[in-house]
């Protein structure tokens, strides 16, 4: 794909996701079918509830990840600056969007050394597509992705359905699994593998765990549907093809349960259709260690650093109150509280 076309595609992605509606998954994330048992006598100080955690050795003040959003286009520079500054202020993790354009043509979109200067203390996740590992210098590109932003972790995203519908997308995925395994051995930074909104099954998660990944992000169905996003960008035919996949994928809550059962000890991120801090509490109760949000943050990210801080402060308040209302003094206790129903 030519560089100008890739940049235009990233701009289109921002506009389409902001418009919402038509590209939302027809599946819900599944959190509404999870119910906590309310604790009317918590015997806790709300303000003393501890939401801090560690993920891959990095301390976090709350179990939130600003998930991969955008990389490359000029507009991404201010978005990524706002996200980095907010993550630093909040003490939460930040995952950048795909760095493919930045690596191939230098259009950094805020994905350079300045990002780490804005957020010197956060857990910072670099990002590259799995299909890019198949290129002759794919493993070198992965190392560059980490180095160019001073990242702690490299995220490899799996998006075969999106690529199948995208004009000019990567259609041959033979050898991707072996390249991920090679990367896990050769890269000094931990490797995290994520989907992009269609979910990881327990079987795929187990294969990835066996090849050496440090953590997984289920990135389940229930939020943005990237098949529909690519359909919006394409011709009438590609839009018609994409529409058939409007309800495709593994809902996030189901994916968390499946992956946790398949990989009991592997660090796990839940993302995909997380709306608020109560959804985050449910994801943690089901087995997640960290909770990510992307599209739900985008409007705030375009506005200002302060808007992003306010957005995640609200989510943190909601999570803290959910702990309080279930009698959980910290995240470990939240993982043990009873559930009323899970259909």
UniProtKB/Swiss-Prot annotation:
CDD domains reported for this sequence: IDI-2_FMN
Catalytic reaction annotation: isopentenyl diphosphate = dimethylallyl diphosphate
Pfam families in UniProt: FMN_dh
Record bears the keyword Transcription: no
Cofactor(s) the record lists: FMN; NADPH; Mg(2+)
Domain of life, per lineage: Bacteria
This protein's name: Isopentenyl-diphosphate delta-isomerase
The organism of origin for this protein: Xanthobacter autotrophicus (strain ATCC BAA-1158 / Py2)
Role according to the record: Involved in the biosynthesis of isoprenoids. Catalyzes the 1,3-allylic rearrangement of the homoallylic substrate isopentenyl (IPP) to its allylic isomer, dimethylallyl diphosphate (DMAPP).
């Amino acid at each position: 794909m030519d560089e100008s076309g890739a940049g235009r595609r990233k701009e289109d992605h921002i506009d389409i996701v902001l418009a919402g509606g038509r590209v939302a998954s027809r599946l819900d994330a599944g959190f509404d079918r999870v119910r906590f048992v309310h604790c009317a006598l918590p015997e806790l100080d709300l303000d003393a509830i501890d939401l801090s955690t560690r993920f891959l050795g990095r301390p976090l003040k709350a179990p939130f990840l600003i998930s991969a959003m955008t990389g490359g286009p000029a507009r991404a520079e201010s978005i990524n600056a706002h996200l980095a500054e907010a993550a630093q202020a909040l003490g939460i993790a930040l995952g950048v969007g795909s760095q493919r354009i930045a690596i191939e043509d230098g259009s950094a979109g805020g994905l350079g050394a300045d990002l780490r200067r804005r957020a010197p203390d956060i857990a910072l996740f670099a990002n590259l597509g799995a299909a890019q590992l198949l290129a002759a210098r794919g493993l070198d590109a992965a190392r560059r992705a980490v180095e160019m932003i001073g990242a702690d972790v490299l995220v490899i995203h799996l998006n075969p359905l999106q690529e199948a519908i995208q004009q000019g997308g990567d259609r041959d995925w033979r050898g991707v699994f072996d390249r991920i395994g090679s990367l896990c051995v050769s890269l000094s930074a931990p490797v995290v593998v994520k989907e992009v909104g269609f979910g990881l099954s327990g079987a795929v998660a187990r294969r990835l765990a066996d090849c050496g990944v440090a953590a997984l992000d289920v990135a389940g169905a229930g939020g943005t549907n990237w098949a529909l996003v690519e359909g919006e960008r394409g011709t009438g035919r590609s839009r018609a093809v994409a529409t058939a996949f409007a309800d495709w994928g593994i809902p996030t809550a189901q994916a968390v349960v499946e992956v946790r059962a398949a990989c009991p000890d592997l660090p796990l991120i839940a993302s995909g259709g997380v709306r608020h801090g109560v959804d985050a509490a449910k994801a943690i109760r089901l087995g997640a260690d960290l909770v990510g949000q992307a599209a739900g943050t985008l409007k705030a990210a375009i506005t200002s650093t302060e808007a992003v801080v306010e957005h995640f402060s609200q989510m943190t308040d909601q999570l803290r109150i959910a702990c309080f209302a279930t009698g959980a003094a910290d995240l470990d206790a939240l993982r043990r509280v009873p559930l009323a129903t899970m259909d």
